Amino acid sequence: MRTEVITVQTGSRPTVRDITAEAERFVSGVGDGLLHVFVPHATAGLAVIETGAGSDDDLLRALDDLLPTDDRWRHRHGSPGHGRDHVLPGLVPPYATLPVIDGRLALGTWQSICLVDTNGDNPTRKVRFSFLPG
């Protein structure tokens, strides 16, 4: 299995960061198999969604509706409302597995691989790409 860890700067505000180009670079020319993407953090996840046209902002707004930044959370260290960040991976999992055909990601026309990070307390994230040959 081939693997690589990249560092992604997400900043201090909730963000949806497109990492498709990095994933495409990793699988370029590797043949057929599966790309497994994993975020080794308790407060971030991965989504395969359309970016641009407002979809990434819509996802963040939906997460705000489902997981408000308020004092309802029992997990209370960090910034106010930080407990919601620890619930995020239950809705936006920290992994995705995608087909690779002839060294190219087999994504749909409008699909992108996105790191979803609502935790402004940790502006630097690691993402692990692993290629499993077919």
Residue ranges, per PLM feature:
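Active-site histidine-anchored catalytic micro-motif
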Residues: M1-G134
